[in-house]
Amino acid sequence: MATSSSSLPDPYGKPNECILQLDGPDARHFLQGQTTADFQKAPVGATVYTAFCNPKGRVLADALAIIISDDTVLLRGRKPVMEALSAHLTPFLAFSKSALRATQWTVVGSGPSSGLQTEPVSAQLIEENDAVTAVVINRGKGFIEYWQGDASVIQPDPEDVVPLARVDFETARARVESSTIGAYLPQDLNYDLNETVNFTKGCYTGQEIVARLHYRGTPKRRLYRAIIANISETPTPGDGITNAEGQRVGSIVNTLPTGEQLGVLIEVTPDSTHGPLLTREQGQALSSLEACHPVTDQSMG
């Protein structure tokens, strides 16, 4: 790992990622009522995966949060998604003793490294002059995610840098894109299976819908990883996926270009995975289908 007194230069910083900073004595309380995660019980330095939903339980934004202190929380997400989220939260912040602002922090992934723990751990906070200037996050499977402020003192080796999209793909972490804001229930993205949703924390926007599906319903779709070989046209997140009969059974969630192949995270009905799947718009076949998490609910029936 190399070190520097300057911030990460291009091509390290990825403008598609944005970090918001929530400050104030009500920061945790505000997030407790707006997101699917339990911010009240999480300790300082914890990594908290969470989602913001609308009243219908649809996901407006996903975020990886780091609790910097009792009064400060950083939230990382796709830049256009976080911009829309900031506008959505503005009316609610008027009644909270907290303020939300965009930062100039950069985000980059690195790995995989066989020397790292396979399971994620709490974030490492890097400080200068009593201020947090960088965050190092073990994403699991040998991948690291770095967040860096203007005056940071740490950066990864350039040879180890990988797109954050690869980190998300390899660790099966579905992301909300600008074209899929409000499109999915948390269960469609397996957020109920990877600790993004806490079902005991109490009320939050959309909680009634999300909890009802968890306790009384059957998730219709689940998250899978797949490959599209010899791509002629790259599908867009939100594009449909069909079975051999042309029936829509799900959609593209995220994409990862890898040369002539395209890695994709998709949400589809579990029953449809027993037969051929095609991209609806391009008619391209999906292969190497793999469930992102073990699914034990009744949706497998």
Annotate the PLM regions.
Residues M1-G301:
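Basic, glycine/lysine-rich polyanion-binding surfaces/domains
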